[in-house]
């Protein structure tokens, strides 16, 4: 949208509309809205709809295009985005569309639209996207509406590309990283901030690659915090974990709680796996930097691990999970390997007997080291981990779930055992209410693990009330006495109340790190 005038024409920009949908919107409603926006075509007039196609919307977009073409056969459909930029000819969505731009579309999409409208007509269906110098790309931020700024997390980019070659990632295909000129970019951020934007998510693959630029961006937001209207500022960056120079640490340490969030891809601590997938990561430095961030900064850490990588076993993944958990980040995202189109991870398919779903999101279903049942078992555990650990609803109770039941056990296996039991009792990973989860945790800790009922109930009570839920789990059905502004059981023992108060105080002091 932002480049339709610069690389097309002023007239083209004026004739272009940007329409966004959610996956929840019925497809017939999307068709009606799109065709209504275009209006009835005049004789000889070309009408164009472009779609950004991703792993998460390709199925719905394929069906949407089929409906559009059935209702208006002369419509020109142009595709772009990562899902159609690789293995292009094999895809149904490509076969039913008119043109595909692979790679960058900032310049190529306006040029293609101008050709379709004014001629000469393009000869090729698949068009390799032109990658211009970044100073030839118009930044899009002026097109953000006031509604966007007031209600949305804003995606911004200070750079594109990535110099690293992790084989599961599409960015591994980039030759390097390219940075936008910093002064104009910061001016755009200032304008957005003055218009009321407070939630910024940087989509740069490696924010802390160029430290001088990182420092200036962090300083920009730090300066905003001195202004009277800085309430609600939240800034999210994706960082590599083993590159945190003192210059960067000094600024990070100045941020107050609730402002800075880092997404930190660990993926695996297994050095053999790291080499197989061309991932360069200093594990010792990674751990040291994570520990520094937790102890010396107020940054919220969202860390990632990937299950199913070639060469990874269940036991080796468990070791990596326990190592990361012991460091204490606020979140650990447990992902499943996906074979994204075009990624070099495909080169391991035969040697490691990798079997993937043939439908999006193309998750791995079996490897030489992980059978199908183990993959299913872990997938369930990952969903329960989100519901219990990453949700923040069980801050006091989670350490009990993670505490090894024996010296031969570990936190990973403790939670896996809970996940196995929860699956056996419910046979579902979706639709579990907060109350059902509270009762499941209570039963596991008191019946399976044999922990003291009153101590477990006190923890769950505090967790449940703090979560803001207002129903009544069975294990807390009688809790009615006042406790710190809330209510507990009138028949609760003094020991229960004292334990709950003590645990709440401990929670306030130590925050919500996953390892308690």
Where are these regions (language model features)?
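Radical SAM enzyme core and accessory elements
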Residues: 13, 35-45, 383-516
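A structural motif corresponding to the C-terminal lobe/cap of the Radical SAM core domain
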Residues: 211, 224-231, 238-243, 247-409
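Radical SAM [4Fe-4S] cluster-binding motif and immediate context
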Residues: 139-295
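A general structural detector for well-ordered alpha-helical segments in enzyme core domains, enriched
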Residues: 1, 33-34, 60, 64, ...
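Conserved acidic residues
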Residues: 47, 98, 198, 260, ...
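Acidic, low-complexity intrinsically disordered segments
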Residues: 1-187, 191-195
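Short acidic (Asp/Glu) and glycine-rich catalytic loops that position anionic groups and cofactors
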Residues: 165-168, 195-200, 354-362, 393-396, ...
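Glycine-rich, histidine-containing beta strand-loop boundary motifs that form or position
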Residues: 20, 53, 81, 103-104, ...
């Amino acid at each position: 949208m932002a480049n339709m005038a610069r690389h097309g024409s002023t007239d083209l920009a004026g004739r272009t509309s940007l329409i966004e949908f959610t996956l929840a919107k019925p497809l017939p409603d999307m068709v009606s809205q799109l065709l209504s926006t275009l209006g009835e075509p005049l004789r000889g007039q070309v009408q164009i709809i472009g779609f950004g196609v991703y792993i998460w919307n390709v199925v719905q977009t394929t069906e949407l295009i089929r409906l559009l073409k059935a209702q208006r056969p002369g419509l020109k459909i142009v595709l772009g985005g990562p899902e159609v930029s690789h293995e292009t000819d094999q895809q149904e969505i490509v076969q039913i569309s008119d043109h595909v731009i692979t790679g960058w579309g900032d310049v190529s999409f306006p040029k293609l639209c101008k050709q379709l409208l004014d001629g000469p007509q393009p000869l090729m269906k698949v068009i390799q996207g032109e990658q211009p110098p970044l100073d030839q790309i118009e930044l899009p931020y002026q097109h953000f509406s006031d509604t966007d700024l007031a209600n949305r997390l804003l995606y911004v980019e200070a750079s594109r590309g990535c110099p690293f070659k992790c084989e599961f990632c599409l960015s591994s295909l980039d030759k390097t990283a390219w940075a936008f000129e910093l002064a104009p970019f910061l001016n755009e951020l200032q304008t957005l901030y003055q218009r009321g934007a407070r939630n910024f998510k940087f989509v740069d693959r490696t924010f802390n690659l160029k430290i001088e630029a990182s420092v200036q961006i962090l300083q920009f937001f730090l300066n905003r915090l001195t202004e009277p209207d800085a309430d609600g500022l939240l800034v999210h960056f994706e960082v590599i974990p083993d590159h945190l120079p003192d210059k960067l640490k000094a600024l990070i340490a100045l941020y107050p709680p609730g402002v800075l969030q880092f997404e930190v891809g660990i993926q695996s601590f297994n050095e053999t796996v790291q080499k197989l997938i061309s991932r360069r990561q200093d594990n010792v430095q990674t751990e040291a930097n994570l520990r520094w961030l937790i102890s010396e900064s107020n940054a919220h850490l969202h860390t990632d691990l990937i299950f199913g990588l070639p060469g990874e076993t269940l036991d080796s993944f468990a070791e990596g999970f326990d190592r990361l958990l012991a460091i204490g980040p606020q979140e650990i995202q447990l992902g499943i390997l996906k074979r994204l189109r075009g990624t070099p991870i495909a080169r391991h398919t035969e040697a490691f007997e990798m079997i993937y779903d043939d439908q999006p999101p193309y998750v791995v279903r079996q490897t030489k080291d992980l059978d199908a049942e183990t993959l299913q078992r872990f997938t369930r555990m990952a969903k329960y981990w989100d519901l219990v650990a990453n949700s923040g609803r069980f801050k006091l109770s989670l350490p009990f779930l993670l505490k090894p039941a024996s010296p031969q056990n570990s936190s990973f296996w403790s939670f896996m055992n809970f996940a196995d039991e929860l699956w056996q009792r419910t046979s579902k990973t979706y639709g579990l209410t907060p109350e059902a989860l509270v009762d499941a945790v209570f039963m596991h800790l008191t019946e399976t693990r044999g922990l003291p009922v009153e101590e477990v109930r006190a923890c769950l009570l505090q967790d449940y009330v703090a979560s803001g839920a207002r129903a009544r789990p069975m294990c807390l059905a009688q809790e009615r006495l006042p406790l710190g502004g809330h209510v507990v059981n009138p028949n609760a023992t003094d020991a229960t109340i004292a334990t709950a108060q003590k645990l709440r105080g401990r929670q306030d002091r130590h925050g919500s790190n996953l390892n308690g």
